[in-house]
């Protein structure tokens, strides 16, 4: 648990919390593959800056957060004003070097006061059992994974897994106790998941075929429509494959901007993108409530993408709100939101 007690506007509480969480876990008995750390990277006057101040970020072409271990980067979040690939890669490497410095500092503390980690046993799967299940399932799993229709594919995989699990349960039910049968079921499912992963990865990496049978550079069927809603300022429908976003844009006076009063300096937004992901879009039922992490995260992603091409306040003195309603989803509804939002 991270509790913010005091905030220096030039030092991000999020990055401080990340550092503190890593250090607290690292010095404890809890097994942990850290330590980790994170930094922000800005780009002002073609020079990279670690943890830029709010004033520097205002003039920065790049707002990049990099987190990772001593050996690798494991999280990236960014918004930018059309930064090229070479610059982005350099920024990542620059940020990772700063991450390493923070981790070295943590290591000094860990070496001094860190506790010995708890030992634990993982579930061990006999080699003979893995080989036997692989022989039984590999060919059928390969066939199921090549089914192009998503629901049909999922049903075929589920039926195959259930068939093989039941085969082993029936085969061993007279010899094993209930607890042993449950453990065997877990082992069989783990083996089947490994087989599914390896076959699917092989299809993608070696054969360059995607989950629905498309080539790596092949795009799903696209369709668009605009001005579907007669009483709105702007509306657009974007469909790619089985993913569909209905985007509605509304204009308001500048005084209707959103006021942001959080831990940082009070700020305001004249452009907002809100993303809604109802349960029916993926064939499920569920209650409607406050936005979850998905809605907040996808909305922020789409907002960052469109914000860079929104006219300045001097050119277009209005508040702009875009709402993306996901009507169906089969991958990358955030991308659909950006396209529909741009058209609306």
Regions found by a protein language model. Give the residues of each.
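Catalytic phosphate-handling regions of large nucleic-acid enzymes and associated NTPases
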Residues: 1-14, 28-51, 242, 249, ...
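Extended amphipathic alpha-helical scaffolds
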Residues: 121-267
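Flexible, glycine/charged-enriched surface loops at secondary-structure junctions
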Residues: 33-35, 102-120, 151-152, 174-188, ...
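Conserved phosphate/anionic-ligand binding catalytic regions in large, soluble enzymes, centered on
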Residues: 11-30, 225-249, 328-344
């Amino acid at each position: 648990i991270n509790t913010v007690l005091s905030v220096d506007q030039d030092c991000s509480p999020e990055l401080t919390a990340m550092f503190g969480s890593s250090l607290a876990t690292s010095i404890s008995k809890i097994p942990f593959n850290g330590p980790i750390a994170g930094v922000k990277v800005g780009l002002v006057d073609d020079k990279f800056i670690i943890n830029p101040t709010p004033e520097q970020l205002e003039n920065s072409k790049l707002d990049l957060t990099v987190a990772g271990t001593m050996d690798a980067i494991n999280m990236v979040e960014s918004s930018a004003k059309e930064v090229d690939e070479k610059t982005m890669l350099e920024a990542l490497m620059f940020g990772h070097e700063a991450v390493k410095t923070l981790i070295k500092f943590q290591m000094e503390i860990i070496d001094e006061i860190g506790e010995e980690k708890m030992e634990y046993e993982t579930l061990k799967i006999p080699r003979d059992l893995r080989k036997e299940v692989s022989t039984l399932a590999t060919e059928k799993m390969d066939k199921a994974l090549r089914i192009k229709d998503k629901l049909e594919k999922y049903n075929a995989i589920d039926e195959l897994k259930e068939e093989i699990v039941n085969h082993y349960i029936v085969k061993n039910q007279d010899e094993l106790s209930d607890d042993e049968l449950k453990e065997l079921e877990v082992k069989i499912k783990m083996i089947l998941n490994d087989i599914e992963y390896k076959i699917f990865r092989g299809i993608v990496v070696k054969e360059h075929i995607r989950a629905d049978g498309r080539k790596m550079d092949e795009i799903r069927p696209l369709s668009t429509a605009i001005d579907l809603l007669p009483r709105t300022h702007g509306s657009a429908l974007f469909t790619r494959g089985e993913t569909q976003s209905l985007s509605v844009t509304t204009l308001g006076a500048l005084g209707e901007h959103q006021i942001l009063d959080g831990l940082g300096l009070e700020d305001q937004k004249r452009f907002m993108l809100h993303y809604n992901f109802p349960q029916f879009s993926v064939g499920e039922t569920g209650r409607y409530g406050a936005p979850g992490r998905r809605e907040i995260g996808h909305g922020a992603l789409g907002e960052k993408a469109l914000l860079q091409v929104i006219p300045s306040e001097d050119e277009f003195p209005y508040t702009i709100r875009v709402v993306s309603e996901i009507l169906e989803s089969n991958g990358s509804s955030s991308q659909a939101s950006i396209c529909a939002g741009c058209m609306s």
